[in-house]
């Protein structure tokens, strides 16, 4: 796992948590939860690629891993759209920077997950 990506995730999550404290938006809490879930999934997939012998373990433990992968891509697309929507509607420069960084991070993570999944297939 790239240490820059890890620190980016942590930075985005901290920033979103601060924004959540300043607003009453429950939607932001959902985004934070999905970001955390996505980070864990990406990390697990990356570890499986690093230990290619785990591919068989991954497949036997979760026979529906392709469905799970598809679901994660749907979540990424939803998060990208949600971040874009919030970016268009915010006037706070702190929030704009946070959402721009979140969007960039989501695109990077989507590419990483695609790369990992192709290596596993």
Swiss-Prot record:
GO terms for cellular component: host cell nucleus; virion component. The keyword Ribonucleoprotein does not apply. GO terms for biological process: exit of virus from host cell nucleus through nuclear pore. It comes from the Viruses. Keywords: Host nucleus, Host-virus interaction, Transport, Virion. InterPro entries: Flu_NS2. Signal peptide: none annotated. It is found in: Virion; Host nucleus. Its main location: virion. A motif (Nuclear export signal) lies at residues 12-21, 85-94. Average number present in a viral particle is estimated to be 130-200 molecules. Interacts with protein M1. May interact with host nucleoporin RAB/HRB and exportin XPO1/CRM1. Belongs to the influenza viruses NEP family. Mediates the nuclear export of encapsidated genomic RNAs (ribonucleoproteins, RNPs). Acts as an adapter between viral RNPs complexes and the nuclear export machinery of the cell. Possesses no intrinsic RNA-binding activity, but includes a C-terminal M1-binding domain. This domain is believed to allow recognition of RNPs bound to the protein M1. HAMAP family: INFV_NEP. This is Nuclear export protein. It comes from Influenza A virus (strain A/Gull/Minnesota/945/1980 H13N6).
